[in-house]
Amino acid sequence: MFKFILKRIALMFPLMIVVSFMTFLLTYITNENPAVTILHAQGTPNVTPELIAETNEKYGFNDPLLIQYKNWLLEAMQFNFGTSYITGDPVAERIGPAFMNTLKLTIISSVMVMITSIILGVVSALKRGKFTDRAIRSVAFFLTALPSYWIASILIIYVSVKLNILPTSGLTGPESYILPVIVITIAYAGIYFRNVRRSMVEQLNEDYVLYLRASGVKSITLMLHVLRNALQVAVSIFCMSIPMIMGGLVVIEYIFAWPGLGQLSLKAILEHDFPVIQAYVLIVAVLFIVFNTLADIINALLNPRLREGAR
């Protein structure tokens, strides 16, 4: 098991190097000189060759590309992502509070997505082929097909504006989490619930279930065995939903005026503030890699066959 964990962790580093290099290259995705991009982003009215040369020297654009990448990576490893092109403030000071706001919303939403997916998936699998199963799948399919921004808008209109129960936007207290969490749960639970249901149905059709039933094992004991084996899907759901939700919160945060990474990154994209964009992309990408690795390790702990297959 220790070797398996080491292999999975070792695989993270090449991926992170590739991701970090691709993130670094975001500065060069435009056809113009990065210095010109910076000057335009700062609203400089007259971009002269002297200003371009000065900006190139200030930001180290005269260095070879690999040297620039090395310097940028060493700073990023210390959570120093440079300064904002627009405000001149350190990016870490802007990213830090926004990251914590997004992380809190993501964790709460991920827990709700996991709980909802497991409950609906288990009930649907146990009632497969019956009215309850068909009703759950139909409602889940319908809700999943609805755009998140539409659901959010409807909730704001009826719950916040007409009924005046919850705040429409911003982060003013614990009640501010309710509407965004509901929207995120609706958007993702319908997707993950199908995975839980499929895993439960597969386990219920396994030979060991038939054997335990024939042996007269109590239903509750039998169900515990099935749930334990199907738990791997729930673990994967929880681990993978965190970076997926965090990476997909741009629209939700914009609608609810949530002071998080999504809204900050959207503003940075519109302003061509590349250091902020780089920090956002790198953080989300690293979270994807870390939580995917964590899911593999936890699943291997739950299922020894996965460890054998990875040797």
Swiss-Prot record:
This is Metal-staphylopine import system permease protein CntB. Residues 99-295 form the ABC transmembrane type-1 domain. Its main location: membrane. Keywords: Cell membrane, Cobalt, Cobalt transport, Ion transport, Membrane, Nickel, Nickel transport, Transmembrane, Transmembrane helix, Transport, Zinc, Zinc transport. Disruption phenotype: Deletion of the cntABCDF genes decreases nickel and cobalt intracellular levels and decreases virulence. It is a multi-pass membrane protein. The chain crosses the membrane at residues 9-29, 105-125, 139-159, 173-193, 237-257, 274-294. CDD domains: TM_PBP2. Pfam families: BPD_transp_1, BPD_transp_1_N. Nickel/cobalt import is reduced in the presence of zinc. Induction: Repressed by zinc. It is found in: Cell membrane. Part of the ABC transporter complex CntABCDF (Opp1) involved in the uptake of metal in complex with the metallophore staphylopine (StP). Involved in the import of divalent metals ions such as nickel, cobalt and zinc. Probably responsible for the translocation of the substrate across the membrane. Plays a major role in nickel/cobalt import in zinc-depleted conditions. Contributes to virulence. Required for full urease activity in vitro. GO terms for cellular component: plasma membrane. The complex is composed of two ATP-binding proteins (CntD and CntF), two transmembrane proteins (CntB and CntC) and a solute-binding protein (CntA). Belongs to the binding-protein-dependent transport system permease family. InterPro entries: BPD_transp_1_N, CntB, MetI-like, MetI-like_sf. Gene3D superfamilies: MetI-like. One of its GO terms (biological process) is nickel cation transport. GO terms for molecular function: transmembrane transporter activity. It comes from the Bacteria.
